[in-house]
Regions:
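Long, domain-scale functional regions
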Residues: 1-229
């Protein structure tokens, strides 16, 4: 298998992203479907704030905590776990760091300083049910941001997906997950509103000419819970 280094971890390990299989024994820069493990929806349903979660609680709940409880596995988590199980054994797993994969579900209401488009001024920070909500990454590293201000800090224990519960939520079965919008920006993509064509830059380190999911919730509005891709 071919991989690209995303960044170092807090414990001096490295995070890597899948980039296809070798061609003639070499891992050249690849694009298109060959760079993906397959295709999957993030969640089958998307009409509630719950569905921005890699795991989620109860749709239709009247509290943030019940909505974002890590009770149900997302569609994409099941898909990734099945791929991992089919391709890696216990020996390989034992050599991998149990690092944090951050599904940052912190909410932040519209702020003109970070999101200048006033058409979003009604977006709040409730984060449950069908309430129109902005999530943290929308302000830091999304198409809607005035500027990029990525962060590798995962604020909530509930959002830190790990196998062990000492440095995270202990909800992962395998040490695998998704890249975040913040990591995408730090790798060179400018996803903010003033430079929306940057994702087409073929010289960018993470360019694949394919759309791929990230871990980062962006918003929930109009019956659509949106995760960055």
């Amino acid at each position: 298998m071919c991989w690209k280094i995303i960044r170092t971890t807090e414990n001096n390990g490295i995070k890597i992203i899948y980039n296809g299989i070798p061609t003639a024994g070499k891992c050249e820069t690849q694009t298109g479907d060959a760079t993906q493990i397959g295709t999957s929806r993030f969640n089958e349903s998307y009409d509630d704030n719950a569905y921005v979660g890699y795991m989620y609680g109860t749709a239709g709940s009247s509290t943030y905590a019940a909505t974002h409880a890590n009770t149900n596995e997302s569609t994409i988590k099941k898909y990734i776990d099945n791929w991992y199980k089919a391709n890696f054994d216990e020996i390989a797993t034992s050599k991998l760091e149990d690092t944090v994969f951050c599904n940052d579900r912190t909410t932040k209401a519209y702020d003109a300083k970070t999101i200048g488009n006033t058409s979003f001024s009604s977006y709040g920070d409730l984060g449950y049910g069908t309430n129109v909500t902005f999530y943290g990454a929308a302000h830091r590293a999304s198409y809607y941001s005035n500027d990029s201000n990525p962060s590798l800090v995962c604020q909530n224990q509930n959002d830190k997906f790990t196998i062990d519960n000492q440095n995270g939520n202990g909800k992962l079965t395998y040490p695998v997950g998704l890249i975040t919008l913040d990591e995408v920006v730090l790798a060179g993509f400018n996803t903010h509103d003033s430079n929306i064509s940057d994702y087409k830059d073929t010289t960018n380190y993470l360019y694949t000419n394919s759309i791929y999911w990230t871990f980062s919730p962006v918003m929930s509005a109009g019956g659509n819970a949106t995760v960055g891709n």
